[in-house]
Regions:
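Long, positively charged binding patches that form subdomain-scale interaction surfaces
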Residues: 167-232, 239-241
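C-terminal motif of bacterial Sec signal peptides marking the signal peptidase cleavage site
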Residues: 39-40
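A hydrophobic, small-residue-rich beta->alpha segment in the mid-to-C-terminal subdomain
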Residues: 252-295
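Short, low-complexity, disordered segments immediately C-terminal to signal peptides
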Residues: 45-62
Length: 320
């Protein structure tokens, strides 16, 4: 009987060795593929999602101005653009686009390029309240010189028997929430018996200090209006960097009214709030920022700007 190569002992040994080598090479290739896939997954952009109406973190619909980005932001982080003393001293040129700002949160307050009105960010949408009271959606390319945002979770709630005044609201929330050395984001939806708001008109270079510009603000009072208070509370130790205490903006449900809140009163309401444990400050990369004296104590002037109200109110803003 003829003997084939496979029947020879030396051939069997060679075949066994070849099989081991082949298996080793297959294992090596598989390992390399797994490593490559793992690296690809780790480098894929993270997507910050907007909470859906049912409370899940489903991605927002296509085309919506929402907080989607490649930046991973802690849910309890406050992010601010520039510092308040720079804005007080007239640094009004926008440095961050609204699209980029939304990477850091879907809730907040601020202003727009050249101090063009009040900025309100609610549910990932941006609203610009102009100096004449009209309200526009903020374009992704619009820039801000100062803003404060956070991803809003509505983690905690506090029932309010009434809102007697803005001062009452501040004091009541401080007592109920506590955490005096941390940042708080607050959202309150209610029907307001009365509310007084302000906005400022767009400025042109050379810019005047905010304390001067605020004297020319437009002020409106409206009764029986339903809408949302958007508030950021900063601890007192941020003086010079942000606004110590509460910074309130308001937006009516029908978008007919909005602005920086000076006074308000309402019946019972529910305050939803987040306690923020992290704080990120993005400094200005703009001409003049490194030479301006930010060490000045502008707190008294800031308090006047935040609460100032002209005796003569402007004509009520037009309804949309």
């Amino acid at each position: 009987m003829a003997i084939t190569d496979f029947d020879r002992p030396e051939a069997t040994s060679q075949l066994t060795t070849s099989g081991l080598v082949l298996r080793w090479m297959q294992s090596l290739v598989t390992s390399l593929l797994l490593l490559a896939l793992g690296a690809g997954c780790s480098q894929a952009p993270a997507v910050a999602t907007q909470p859906a109406a049912n409370g899940s973190n489903a991605p927002a619909e296509n085309g919506a101005q929402t907080a989607t980005s490649s930046v991973s932001v802690p849910r309890d982080q406050i992010t601010q653009i520039s510092v308040i003393n720079a804005l007080m001293l007239g640094h009004y040129d926008g440095i961050t686009t609204f699209e980029e700002l939304l990477r850091y949160g879907d809730f907040g307050v601020g202003t727009l390029n050249q101090l063009d009105g009040e900025l309100i960010i609610l549910d990932g949408q941006g609203y610009q309240v102009h100096g004449d009271g009209t309200i526009d959606r903020v374009a992704p390319s619009a820039k801000t010189p100062f803003a404060v945002v956070t991803p809003f979770d509505r983690a905690e709630q506090q029932k309010l028997p009434q809102i007697e005044s803005l001062e009452w609201l501040d004091d009541h929330l401080d007592e109920a929430i506590g955490h005096p050395n941390k940042f708080i984001a607050v959202r309150i939806h209610a029907n307001f018996a009365t509310i007084t708001l302000r906005s400022v008109k767009v400025q042109s270079p050379p810019y005047r200090p905010l304390g001067v510009v605020a004297k020319e603000q437009s002020v409106w009072t409206r009764e029986n209006v339903t809408g949302t208070l958007i508030g950021i509370r900063c601890p007192k130790w941020v003086q010079g960097l942000n606004v110590p205490g509460y910074h309130w903006h308001f937006l009516a449900d029908d978008l007919s009214l909005g602005g920086h809140v000076l006074k308000c009163a309402a019946g019972s309401a529910l305050a939803e709030y987040d306690v923020c444990q992290e704080w990120l400050v993005r400094l200005v990369d703009a001409p003049g920022f490194d030479t301006v004296n930010l060490n000045q104590d502008l707190n008294r002037e800031l308090r006047r700007v935040e609460s100032a109200r002209d005796d003569e109110e402007s004509e009520a803003p037009p309804n949309k």
